[in-house]
Amino acid sequence: MKKHFVLLFFLLLVAVAEAANPVKQMLERLQEGLSDRFKIEIRSSSDEGDYFELYGGGRKVTVRANNYVSAAFGINWYLKYYCHAHVSFCGDQLPQLPVDLPQVKERHATKLSDNFYMNYCTFSYTTAFWNWKRWEREIDLMALSGINMPMAMVGVEAVWRNTLLKFGYTLPEVKEFLCGPAYFGWLLMGNLENIGGPLPDEWFKEQIVLQKKILARMREYGMKPVFQGFFGMVP
């Protein structure tokens, strides 16, 4: 009876760990059942560098890496170079994988610890009106591309608004200062103010909720979000 209880407890722990694995969840978003084709092992590296190893084949390929982002990057490597699949920011070509996966034995490592992504202009040109579904997709693609230090600028305008109000600015003055979403990049670089505004109150609430989801997912992967600091500009 005791042995059965220990076994049941162990299986429960495994199930919980699988459910909490962001790479497994990402693979299911890419294609139903895809997570079953990869075994993911997270192990630290003695030389303190990022790495991934691929080995096995047939029913399942094992991916060993020092973190979730490295594991996701390794899976993307395998899909691209062994399964001739393509998952990218511009679209996917991801057919059903063969019953017998191609055999593989590879190891790749890097001494580069910070892989930064995005800039202010890209943020405003591209992401200004994204919802959670689109951001979820983008964060998955970041992981598949090995990115571990993404910009996290969503909702910065809410921080500006709250801070200025606490410093005694009136709400009309704050609204006059902040620009519209398509111009946030230039506001955050200190280049302009007011253009495209004012923003409705509901916008700030929605962006705060969205940013919390974005940060939670980035941190699940082990990414280090980059936030906006104060650069000396005031109304």
What are these regions (language model features)?
Residues 2-4, 85-89, 147-152:
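Short secondary-structure capping/junction motifs at helix and strand boundaries
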Residues 4-14:
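Sec-dependent N-terminal signal peptides
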Residues 9, 74, 235:
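Active-site-proximal flexible loops/turns
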Residues 12-13, 77, 230:
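Alpha-helical transmembrane segments and their juxtamembrane interfaces
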Residues 16-19, 235:
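Short, intrinsically disordered, charge-balanced linker/junction segments flanking boundaries
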Residues 19-112:
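Contiguous, structured surface segment used for ligand recognition
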Residues 42-45, 57-64, 68, 93-94, ...:
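Aromatic-lined carbohydrate-binding surfaces of glycoside hydrolases
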